[in-house]
């Protein structure tokens, strides 16, 4: 099973933008009900799509949003949670704001599957 990786803003470039596999990034924050609802969905998807896509989680704090402390938040306009983005070859291809069920998420990923 592909392991879901948690990355910091310092690891984002290497783990997301420079990865060979397509990457699904889940931008989340603490205390977010819809973010918590995505955990079992992402776990199931990680197992289902093993070797086809890498799932990465990136925690965003309120300081990142309100005080501009994260280049990622600025670059990709992450302002609501969860925000899901698909990256391939260092380029963001698609984004979604809000939680998705597994089948909806598979449709969202059609651009790289």
Q: What function would you assign to each model-found segment?
A:
Residues 20, 28-31, 80:
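Short pre-active-site segment immediately N-terminal to redox-active cysteine/selenocysteine motifs
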């Amino acid at each position: 099973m592909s392991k879901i990786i948690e990355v910091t803003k310092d690891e984002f470039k290497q783990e997301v933008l420079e990865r060979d596999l397509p990457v699904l990034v889940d931008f989340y924050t603490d205390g977010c009900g819809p973010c918590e609802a995505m955990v079992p969905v992402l776990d199931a998807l990680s197992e289902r799509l093993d070797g086809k896509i890498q799932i990465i989680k990136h925690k965003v704090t309120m300081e990142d949003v309100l005080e501009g402390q994260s280049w990622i938040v600025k670059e990709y306009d992450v302002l609501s949670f969860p925000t899901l983005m698909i990256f391939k070859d260092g380029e963001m291809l698609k984004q979604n704001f809000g939680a998705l069920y597994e089948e909806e998420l598979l449709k969202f990923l059609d651009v790289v599957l």
